[in-house]
């Protein structure tokens, strides 16, 4: 899906904005000390405050404020000197109080941006700045489980788990600057990456730690007014975000071209059927009857505290990507892969700091090491094969002490147990044969054992050199220096 989609009636442009709900990784909830542990038995992490029982008062968790401000700083948002909490009124079974504590007209932060690298299919990767309207704090709702349906309508009965109710959220609202499903997915991915680098959220979409709602409309041309906006929910992966946007763009275009109206509504993404379906009409902010929460005072973050938090921010993914390209000469792709996960980036930098060449380290991490880590669901921070041990192995390869083939053979043991590649090589006699005299002797023995192939080579069948290289590697157990072996073999085959 491109930014402008051609049709019989001209070019259509999609206008997309995202509301990203990030669960902040505090041990207790936003206004009470109830636990935030995921996956425990239903309704075991609730208390009178969560349930809104008479006589209870909420108290803001200071760690929530710190995490929200740090997230806002990383998104280049302006931190408000004063902000407040409001009550968002609506009735639904997942809200025990019948209102949600959120922030309406005075959020903690406004007017920011991030830049995302977008790799559209068939196009060069491009950089795009996406505006961010605001970040505000709020409490999460409980979770409904509908028997016999994926929503309330059509279910035989519903169960509610309030363990999630009251968990702290940072809602990040983008400006309508996105134009394709791919841009939307890349934006959401970068938001999660930043939150993980900060350590304020694990961003696990399967557990609901990061949830995105898409607001999308289409218009005929970049100068046309916005069309009717539709909200899409129920996307639990970046791929689903992209596909939902692409489907909805086409659905709206077809509706307009058929003379039908596009209704302002909330729709659900159906992963199985790969389509969006109507859920309910979309409420406006006036429907929620916001008013300041009388139980919570205004929020003021003093300058000294704010700047103290700023000094604790890590180097962010975009800065790392740029530095890796400049400092280490890595490609855009390599820099992107290595910085996708904070622990992977730290592992890479530690190996390079131990003296290994950056490109070699990058190749091993992105290949065999990443495959092992992902297959075994491990973390780079706890991997037995430490960065300095990887650096030693890469240095052995670059120094001609072992071949890449030998490194691959010993790597599984190193990944599982850790240890020194040099010690294993020395103990098992796996070092590369780089003595010209020794290789010359082996080459001469091979040529003497295959006179017909030698004659054929000298008769013009030069591809037979590959046969001799294979025989040489087989005879030496893959330990012959490939460059030197090819050089001597070529010389001897030509009669030298």
Curated annotation (Swiss-Prot):
Any Pfam family matching the protein: GatB_N
Cystine pairs: none
Coiled-coil ranges (or none): none
EC top class, as a word: ligase
Alphabetized PANTHER family for the sequence: GLUTAMYL-TRNA GLN AMIDOTRANSFERASE SUBUNIT B MITOCHONDRIAL AND PROKARYOTIC PET112-RELATED, GLUTAMYL-TRNA(GLN) AMIDOTRANSFERASE SUBUNIT B, MITOCHONDRIAL
Domain of life assignment: Bacteria
EC number from the UniProt entry: 6.3.5.-
Catalytic activity: L-glutamyl-tRNA(Gln) + L-glutamine + ATP + H2O = L-glutaminyl-tRNA(Gln) + L-glutamate + ADP + phosphate + H(+); L-aspartyl-tRNA(Asn) + L-glutamine + ATP + H2O = L-asparaginyl-tRNA(Asn) + L-glutamate + ADP + phosphate + 2 H(+)
Keywords attached to this entry: ATP-binding, Ligase, Nucleotide-binding, Protein biosynthesis
Protein name, as recorded: Aspartyl/glutamyl-tRNA(Asn/Gln) amidotransferase subunit B
Record function comment: Allows the formation of correctly charged Asn-tRNA(Asn) or Gln-tRNA(Gln) through the transamidation of misacylated Asp-tRNA(Asn) or Glu-tRNA(Gln) in organisms which lack either or both of asparaginyl-tRNA or glutaminyl-tRNA synthetases. The reaction takes place in the presence of glutamine and ATP through an activated phospho-Asp-tRNA(Asn) or phospho-Glu-tRNA(Gln).
Family indicated by similarity: Belongs to the GatB/GatE family. GatB subfamily.
An example molecular function term from Gene Ontology annotations: ATP binding
GO biological process assignments: glutaminyl-tRNAGln biosynthesis via transamidation; translation
NCBIfam families: gatB (TIGR00133), PRK05477.1-2 (NF004012), PRK05477.1-4 (NF004014)
Subunit structure: Heterotrimer of A, B and C subunits.
